[in-house]
């Protein structure tokens, strides 16, 4: 069993305080604050942003595994996770995560791609950990074969 470690350090009260988030690998060492949770344009991160990054990364790796297992090698996968953070009553909640992925995958058809993307969403370990949260998926196939053909046609017209 693998165990991954992350640490949060905080100084001060909730509103004026601030802290640092680090991970065991050393790859992340960033400031965070209450203000960075509620206001755009802050130079610090927040737990929701990091959760979105973790979910986007996990889902994308799961989709790559699904595609590879079905005999397709993706040229590129690009996923954005939008995490909705809302005040409900006296508390804040993560109410929804929207995954939006686009992919260049030679030779895969739309039906197969959509089925594999749905399976990746369902079985990604982070999706499973967030089962109490509504998770939606919009998957767009930018077929690499078609893109190449369109580029060749456009170049031929000049």
Positions of PLM-derived features:
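Extended beta-strand/beta-hairpin segments
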Residues: 1-53, 60-158
